[in-house]
Design a protein with these regions (language model features):
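SAM/dcSAM-binding transferase cores
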Residues: 2-53, 67-73, 241-292
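C-terminal substrate-binding/active-site "lid" region of AdoMet-derived donor-dependent transferases
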Residues: 3, 188-254
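The AdoMet/dcAdoMet-binding core of the Class I SAM-like
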Residues: 3-17, 75-196, 238
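N-terminal glycine-rich anion-binding loops that anchor highly charged ligand groups
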Residues: 51-61
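Short, small-residue-rich loop/turn micro-motifs
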Residues: 62-64, 177
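Short, surface-exposed beta-strand-loop junctions and turns on beta-sheet-rich folds
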Residues: 64-67, 164
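A generic structural signal for alpha->beta connector loops
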Residues: 119-121, 144-146, 201, 227-229, ...
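Alpha-helical subdomain
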Residues: 181, 185-188, 208-214, 267, ...
Length: 292
């Protein structure tokens, strides 16, 4: 996705912090004052970087919303709480062979899985070529035998998988643009295709940011497709809700296994999922499933 005629153009002075700069991927020679004007008035239509001494973030506007965030001293770290919660799929499938990600962003989850899940093949599907073009600036590794980035519509990609009978162990959905979450991944057809692509043992995880009533409608639709239990983990600070669904959540015989998987993830990766396990146990009780 590299283009020798494009480079990162740095613009300062937009924020009050002198250590904070904005970086735009534009053709060499693009006037800085034009970039300053366009981003300030909200007419700039591409993702850009906001960088200080500690973090590099991807944004679509100067509205306080961050699309992706990276620590400069540890590019593969999961800095956002919701990304750590999404890794809760490891509770249900500790060693997935394949993980499909809908939405690349700055590649936080892709980088983390590539570094730590050494037997897992990760495919990240991203519709925006401009987002993919920034991958090297977020230290997303080049494609190899365990990582592949695809420039395609994620809902269409999953529909093709379902139509061809292809399967994956995990689907992670974190598909946002300047207008919010991609509408296509909230449609029932997408959920049904995702369920088919996951088969009998796959786990579905989606990050939702929306008003409470809207979230509840989406959660009920997910429940109507995947069945109960559907587990919702709400972030206290940023309003994200991470939702888990799929057959592995339903089997009470696997409850002890989920605990062991959670302990393994905590010891090996420093990822802890007490809220997920507590919610799972509560849902099992309410549904009449006996968890040891």
């Amino acid at each position: 996705m590299s283009n020798p005629t494009h480079k990162l153009i740095t613009v300062g002075g937009i924020t009050t912090d002198r250590n904070t700069v904005l970086k735009f991927r534009e053709p060499t020679g693009t006037p800085r004052d034009a970039l300053f004007r366009d981003v300030a008035n909200g007419s700039y239509r591409k993702p850009f970087l906001v960088e200080d001494l500690e973090y590099r973030t991807m944004c679509f506007a100067l509205d306080g919303c961050t699309q992706s965030e990276m620590r400069l001293d540890d590019p593969a770290a999961l800095t956002c709480e919701y990304t750590r919660k999404m890794m809760g799929f490891l509770v249900f499938t500790a060693r997935p062979k394949q993980v499909l990600m809908i939405g690349l962003g700055g590649g936080s989850l892709a980088k983390y899985c590539h570094r730590h899940l050494l037997t897992t093949r990760v495919t990240a599907v991203e519709i925006d070529a401009e987002v993919i073009a920034l991958r090297t600036h977020f230290h997303v590794p080049p494609d190899d035998a365990r990582l592949r980035v695809v420039n395609e519509d994620g809902a269409h990609y999953v529909a093709q998988m379902a139509g061809k009978g292809q399967r994956t162990d995990v689907i992670l959905v974190d598909a946002y643009d300047r207008f919010g979450i991609a509408k296509a991944v909230l449609e029932r057809a997408f959920m049904e295709n995702a369920k088919q692509a996951l088969g009998a043992h796959g786990v579905f995880v989606i990050n939702l940011v929306a008003e409470v009533d809207e979230c509840e409608r989406h959660i009920e639709m997910i429940r109507s497709v995947f069945g109960d239990p559907v587990i919702v983990i709400a972030m206290k600070r940023d309003g994200n809700r991470v939702i888990f669904a799929g057959n592995p959540l339903r089997n009470p015989r696997h409850f002890m296994l989920t605990r062991r998987n959670a302990e393994r993830a905590g010891g090996k990766l420093g990822l802890f999922f007490p809220t997920l396990l507590r919610h799972l146990g509560t849902r099992h009780e309410r549904l009449g499933l006996r968890s040891p």
